[in-house]
Regions:
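RNA-contacting regions in translation and RNA-metabolism proteins
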Residues: 1-130
Length: 130
């Protein structure tokens, strides 16, 4: 991206959330296209080669962008910190462009869903012991 974006936490806390009304298919496509475009622009700087970005709607209505490709560990980072930062950037950029907040999850080859399953399994086993 050639433009500099001023990143500010206040952007993510705007009162212009879209939670009141569901988005039309065209609006959802625009949100997805905007987020994917921003993600592709940022991925150029990681030199990860050819990647595929799958988009789908999560259980809670969020837009999930799942990146697949070869040797993507650099996108996850230590304890998922790089992936969290990437998700934050994509959310901020998308909010700036579309004008309202829409939940976006950036994942790498299902990393976040695997981590969630591990945590749920640990919680169940801890609950049984208690």
């Amino acid at each position: 991206m050639s433009e500099e974006l001023e990143i500010n936490d206040q952007v993510l806390n705007q009162e212009t959330d879209s939670a009141d009304e569901p988005l039309s298919d065209e609006e959802l496509d625009f949100v997805a296209d905007t987020a994917i475009s921003a993600l592709k622009d940022i991925l150029k700087y990681f030199n990860v080669g050819e990647v595929t970005i799958d988009e789908y709607e999560g259980d809670d209505g969020e837009l999930i962008l799942d990146i697949t490709g070869d040797d993507l560990a650099v996108l996850i980072g230590r304890h998922g910190r790089t992936l969290d930062a990437l998700q934050f950037l994509i959310s901020v950029i998308t909010v700036r462009i579309i004008g309202f907040r829409y939940p976006i999850v950036v994942d790498v080859e299902g990393y976040k869903s695997r981590q969630r399953q591990k945590l749920e399994s640990l919680a169940r086993s801890s609950a049984k012991k208690a």
